[in-house]
Amino acid sequence: LARLPVIVGFGGINSAGRTSFHQAYRRIIFDLLPNDLQQEVLLDLANITQIAEFQNGLWLTADGEALDAETLIDTFGEEILARTLIRRIHPSLFDVDNVVLHKSSALSPVSEGEKLSFSVKTRSLPDNIPANWQVKALSNTHSEITVDGTLETFIKDTKSLSVKAAGQLPTGFDPAKLYQSRNHPRGLQMTVYGASDAILSSGLDWDVVRNQVAPDQIAVYAANSIGQMDDLGFGGMLKSALMGKRTTSKHLPLGYAQMPADFVNAYVLGSVGNVGTSIGACATYFFNLERAIESIKSGKIRVAMVGGSDAPITPEIIEGFRTMGALAEDTALLALDLLENQKEPDHTRSCRPFAQNCGFTIGESSQWTLLMDDELAIDLGATIYGAIPAVYAFADGYKKSISAPGVGNYLTVSKAMAYLQNIIGKEGLTKHTFIQAHGTSTPQNRVTESHVLSKAATSFGADAMPVTAMKAYLGHSQGTAGGDQLHLSLGVWEHGVLPGIVTSSEVADDVYQAGLKFQLKHEEYGKTHFDAALLNSKGFGGNNATAVLLAPHKAIELLKKRYSEEQIEEYYEKNAAIKSAATAYNEAMIRGEIKPIYRFGFNVLGGEELDISEQQIKLPGYEIPVDLNVTNDFEDLI
């Protein structure tokens, strides 16, 4: 029998805040929360954004005021909320009104017959002196240059970006300050924070977990879709020479797209188990999730950390997407709202999935999911937040433009619906399942994805499957977007509210709606109304994926058929302690008392420390050895 992959921990950070304990989800449905939970969300964000620091039972502001929680919220509540979700890009990343560029120019003398001359530090002279230059030493440090003809130059300039909105991490949050970041690119700083959050919020002791399984039965599958493109990664490597700077030894290696997985193995978990990076544009998270799911179901691995960390809010990436016509520009947003005398649009409504829209809004996020097989979760008493029995991924086939949509998403959605129907029945699929759409907010996406979803839904007999899209709040975090969709969906079963696409006032006329119910408002369905969710992704290049997510109550219902009443009762007894530890972590995080896991140089192993025999490999620090009694899958060929 196949093992059931269950979610036992999740965490990270996006523009809505910390993911664990549904804090980011709660920010999205903030207005529907009771007062005590609103206060918890605001205090957590106050700590994250560094508006206040918890000390001696009070909240200390940057001005030195010591406030109680109620006063802090009354004073800063609106400001805290304004620092989240999609909004105008804050200068802490870069100044959208003054982005540096260089213009190519040819300088020539004002009067005919004259020559250009200037002085420069001798050490700044080019290695290869142009043929039309005459160089004369002025002193030990400076030289005079006389140019015969024109001087080819790059003149520094600035410009204002036409795209000014993004799903930026909460303003004031700086992951580099939380550990010894050593010039790590932003995406890797976010990785350390996000992966730590997922592990610690589970309430599980990681040393206990890893000593329950063999070292090679733990896996990390993670990536981002673009690489670390900021100045501390590939971005610095590509432009440093043109900016008159030096390439460092870290630019290239830390820029690789697989680095989130590498960092988790090397500095967070210390894992020597299976590792892999699948990259597929917007579907990257689901591609890595699929690998984990299939490996757990087959028994190859028992524990998997799936993750992604994308930090694509850079001028270069924004300009790249803009020239494709993919991003929502300010002028287009103003035109959509018929605002002629307004300088800037409402940036908080930049992303409008399935409505009249004009492009997606870029976002940044780091999301991490801790999965186990059902047997291990039951043995440990791990909290089960849901189960993922299947992920489907298919390509588009032949096409003209590589970025154009194709048929692959019809296959992934239809396969996922068929699989889910086999588990929860036709009524469960059509009446008790919601769809977490890709929902980018481009005119093309609203037509093509709605047709995919409508065609599949009606084919299975659905008449009103709820459809929502979290990019309306978070923006498009590229390869990590699937993690945003997954983790915010889990909140529906904690609070019973399906978030609506509130930035979209009405569904566009060209959107296919048969069999679907586009959720434009938050709606309370109840915690157990939905048995499952379908998480969809349509990526550039033909990278399509759809994940099947089972509700926690449905996962437990299924497991009760595999385990005895006594085993389930024992599980709940163990789980009480796990939940208590997780709750203590959440409370400590709100107070800012917990730092990310970052174990640089911790328990580093060398080959001489391994005990290798013909049957097994023993590693220091691991109770269970790696088994070398490997099964031959091709005995019939021997």
Spans of features found by a protein language model:
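Acyl-CoA/ACP chain-elongation machinery
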Residues: 300-358, 391-405, 437-446, 463-516
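Conserved small-residue
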Residues: 195, 220, 292, 321, ...
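A glycine- and small-residue-enriched flexible loop/hinge segment at structural boundaries
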Residues: 4-17, 30-208, 222-237, 256-274, ...
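Conserved catalytic cysteine-centered active-site region
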Residues: 41-48, 104, 142-189, 227-291, ...
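Active-site-proximal alpha-helical scaffold in enzymes
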Residues: 190-204, 257, 261, 275-310, ...
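Condensing-enzyme catalytic core mediating Claisen C-C bond formation in acyl metabolism
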Residues: 2-15, 22, 332-426, 433-434, ...
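Beta-strand segments within the central parallel beta-sheet cores of soluble alpha/beta enzyme folds
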Residues: 208-220, 274-280, 304-309, 383-392, ...
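Phosphate/pyrophosphate-binding loops at sites that engage ATP/ADP/AMP, CoA/4′-phosphopantetheine
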Residues: 199-214, 268, 377-381, 413-434, ...
